[in-house]
Every structure is written in C-alpha cells, then in structure tokens.
C-alpha cells in the first residue's frame, strides 16, 4: 500500500474517521495540522510559541509556520509512512509543500479524495448535533469548500496523484475502497 498520503474531501465526508482507521491498520502517522499545532504549543517548542502568539491574537497561522511544523514532524518519522490531513488547503500551499517533501525525499504517493453527495453530507453534519451546524451554515461551508478546493483537486489530478473514493456506505466499506485504490 502507498505510504505517503494526503486526504481531501468536504466536511462530513469521514476524513478523520478514515484517517484514524488507515493509520492504525497500516502503521502510518496521522498528521492533522490542527493537532500538530496544538502539540507544538503544548510542548512549548519555538515553533509552538510562535504559533501560540499568532493564535492568541485571533489570527491564522501562516503557511510558512505550518510548513515548518510539518517539516519537523516528517523529519522525525525515520521512514514511517504518513497521512497528511487538513493541509494543503489550496494550490499555493500545495506548491509550497511539494519542494519541502522533495527535500525530505518523501514525495506524496497518493491524494485520496473522499466524495459524497451534498444531501448526505448535510444529513451527516446535522446528525453530529453541534451548535454551529445548522443547514444554512453547512450549505455555506460546502460552497466555500468547493470554491477553495476544486483548484487543489485539479492540481493533484494533473499530477496523476488523485484517487477518488465514494464515501457512502459503512465505515468498513469505505475503508476497503480506499485500501483498494492505494494497493
């Protein structure tokens, strides 16, 4: 199975669930950028202190800082496979990530795109019961996702890395479809 992966997909497609399962089953390291940022802050590293300062001001952490944290994490893996989730979110970030991965001799082997009809996504997200998840907010999140992510999807499609997977059905059925395209 391919060992260096990116996960893309709309909110509610099951990226977190599938990432955890695949990483557990195949010994991959799950690199969620949100989790990585929180871990760096918690550890009190220089990168974490910089990230904390930015987040405390209510600002977005810069791409360069996220890339530095990703680079530090990947550099410490000693050849272990990985699954990057939550980054890159746009083509500019992807174009910044690619040379970093080449430098580490860890290029992306596959980009998994979890696809699901909007109606099913809305149903899934509403069933989570989160306060901020009403249908209007969810529909807007899906529009924003499509606008921001379509060029990124095309970027990886043109590079021959994109693997689309239908994200409907049972968790196990989806996992098997993902494993099938990564074999």
Swiss-Prot record:
GO terms for molecular function: adenylate kinase activity; ATP binding. Gene3D superfamilies: P-loop containing nucleotide triphosphate hydrolases. Keywords: ATP-binding, Cytoplasm, Kinase, Nucleotide biosynthesis, Nucleotide-binding, Transferase. GO terms for biological process: AMP salvage. It catalyses: AMP + ATP = 2 ADP. It holds the Pfam family ADK. Belongs to the adenylate kinase family. Catalyzes the reversible transfer of the terminal phosphate group between ATP and AMP. Plays an important role in cellular energy homeostasis and in adenine nucleotide metabolism. This is Adenylate kinase. It comes from Synechococcus sp. (strain CC9311). The lineage of its organism: Bacteria, Bacillati, Cyanobacteriota, Cyanophyceae, Synechococcales.
